[in-house]
Amino acid sequence: MLLSRAISVVALLACICCGVHTQDSKADLGTLRTTDSAIITSQRRLRTSVDLVDNEERFRWPFQQFFKDRWHRKQIKTYFRDQKDNVSEGLVEQLIARHGLKNVEKVLSEVKFPLAVQISIRKILVNYKGKQAFTRPHLTPADTL
């Protein structure tokens, strides 16, 4: 947006220097300046008027979620390495609840399992996703079909 404003200001300045539309261009240039400054001040007000208690996410570092997800995946990998042949449905659901479905699916795509265990884990994930869809208040079983 600022780039388009800058281009239009440069175009107006070129027109003023050449003598084309001098009266109208000066008025447009003044309007552009006031509009830009109004936009910038409103953005500054929004940034400075944030309530610190309600908006904690503003102070999160961009890489914080990356390291958190990485830690969760490491925990899941250690569990799956220890229980490679003997994976139960309840424990997989606990892992999903504790570490998130996205992290469990990511680890499952990286870790190699025997085929029977892999099929049972996929069934658990499908059942878990189905339970999630039915427990959402705005969805009915007819909506998910």
Swiss-Prot record:
Belongs to the RxLR effector family. The keyword Signal applies. Secreted effector that triggers a robust hypersensitive response (HR) in Lactuca sativa cv. Design that is resistant to multiple B.lactucae races, including Bl:24. It comes from Bremia lactucae. It is found in: Secreted; Host cell membrane. A motif (RxLR-dEER) lies at residues 44-58. Its main location: secreted. Residues 1-22 form the signal peptide. It comes from the Eukaryota. Keywords: Host cell membrane, Host membrane, Membrane, Secreted, Signal. This is RxLR effector protein BLR40.
